[in-house]
């Protein structure tokens, strides 16, 4: 739920107008909209590069993943791993636009630990893949933009640990 929706729901539940503090938070959210959209556009435009380079970093750091017996061994399983990275990048992009972790939380994390555990996929590997995407993205963004995106990458990484 966005800051706008939360503020309205809270105010309405108390049958009151929005408070000055709520209006300030909404103003800040609206004012940061162009920046969030710019970040999302950069992530979207560079998604293939981000996923490919992050995959390369992941497989260098964790060769066990692509070795015989590893969860990303073989072309099909490597493609599945990269597909999962792309999925998390998409959710992070949604969260940047929303200015909230809810897209990551509600779309991407519900039941994910159980699913990966049932498949024998190490969560540490998934976290490392997301960390690798964060590293690639940090080279595409600067300053406040990088910090904004990093927050959502860190949230997803933390959920996998």
Curated annotation (Swiss-Prot):
Modification sites for N4-methylasparagine: 71
Amino-acid positions noted as binding (2R,3E)-phycocyanobilin in the UniProt annotation, renumbered to this chain: 81
Protein name from the UniProt record: Allophycocyanin alpha chain
Family: Belongs to the phycobiliprotein family.
Lineage of producing organism: Eukaryota, Rhodophyta, Bangiophyceae, Cyanidiales, Cyanidiaceae
CDD domains: APC_alpha
Subunit-level organization: Heterodimer of an alpha and a beta chain.
A biological-process GO annotation: photosynthesis
InterPro entries found in the cross-reference section: Globin-like_sf, Phycobilisome_asu/bsu, Phycobilisome_asu/bsu_sf
Keyword RNA-binding attached: no
Main location: plastid
Cited function: Light-harvesting photosynthetic bile pigment-protein from the phycobiliprotein complex. Allophycocyanin has a maximum absorption at approximately 650 nanometers.
UniProt PTM comment: Contains one covalently linked phycocyanobilin chromophore.
Location of the protein in the cell: Plastid, Chloroplast thylakoid membrane
Pfam families tied to this protein: Phycobilisome (PF00502)
Keyword entries, A-Z: Antenna complex, Bile pigment, Chloroplast, Chromophore, Electron transport, Membrane, Methylation, Photosynthesis, Phycobilisome, Plastid, Thylakoid, Transport
Topological type in the membrane: Peripheral membrane protein
GO cellular component annotations of the record: chloroplast thylakoid membrane; phycobilisome
């Amino acid at each position: 739920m966005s800051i706008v929706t939360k503020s309205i729901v809270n105010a309405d539940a108390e049958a009151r107008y929005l408070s000055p503090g709520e209006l300030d938070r909404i103003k800040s959210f609206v004012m940061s909209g162009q920046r969030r959209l710019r970040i999302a556009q950069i992530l979207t435009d560079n998604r293939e590069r981000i996923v490919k380079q992050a995959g390369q970093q992941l497989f260098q750091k964790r060769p066990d993943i692509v070795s015989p017996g590893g969860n990303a061994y073989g072309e099909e399983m490597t493609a599945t791993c990269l597909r999962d990275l792309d999925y998390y990048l998409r959710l992070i992009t949604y969260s940047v636009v929303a200015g909230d972790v809810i897209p990551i939380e509600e779309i991407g994390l519900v039941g994910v630990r159980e699913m990966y555990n049932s498949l024998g996929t190490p969560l540490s590997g998934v976290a490392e893949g997301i960390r690798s995407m964060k590293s690639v993205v940090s080279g595409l963004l600067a300053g406040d933009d990088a910090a904004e995106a990093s927050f959502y990458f860190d949230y997803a990484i933390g959920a996998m640990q």
